[in-house]
């Protein structure tokens, strides 16, 4: 029996884009996972609830290695929503969807890093390390709900960081505007990292895993141009002249 659909309402299908964290692992995966664990330990809840895309572009791996990596990430509560740059031969049933055409967030001007792997005709084939970028500059304000994550070095924001936004840097953070959101410098263990901002109204600041919440900051520093640094296990702050 044929069922006739008489409901005049149509099914609405829309396309939307969402901000996702891109993880670009390096070989060997064991060493990369150690560095990831260190980041997660110093930034509690860092990956909790975040959409994550796994970029395996140009990595000489097979399906079993990819499945093992996804399983390791799952044990760390890192949920992979998609895989970019994977050869069709290494994908299989039960894996996250293959993605292509991804690009850096259009709101930001982030230097692109192309992975380089050189295969030599020698008994042991060793992939070269991906090129390291030491700093990035974001030339627009960072809006609520957005995240800038750059574990390789310093982050400079030519603008303000809204409440609910966050900056995570392996090095120092420079904000030429108001810091209302969260700023986490030295995320991979760089205790010498600093945070600089033109106007301090932060929800949270952290250096090398040491946190200070808004209510813990001296009242005389609120709304001021400030630099923050780590001294022992305490975050110190002073006004900028």
UniProtKB/Swiss-Prot annotation:
Keywords: Cell cycle, Cell division, Septation. Transmembrane segments: none annotated. The keyword Ribonucleoprotein does not apply. Coiled coil: none annotated. Gene3D superfamilies: 2.160.20.70, 3.30.70.260. It holds the Pfam family MinC_C. GO terms for biological process: cell morphogenesis; division septum assembly; regulation of cell septum assembly. InterPro entries: CAP/MinC_C, MinC, MinC_C_sf, Septum_form_inhib_MinC_C. It comes from the Bacteria. The keyword Cell division applies. PANTHER family: SEPTUM SITE-DETERMINING PROTEIN MINC. HAMAP family: MinC. Belongs to the MinC family. Interacts with MinD and FtsZ. This is Probable septum site-determining protein MinC. It comes from Rhizobium rhizogenes (strain K84 / ATCC BAA-868) (Agrobacterium radiobacter).
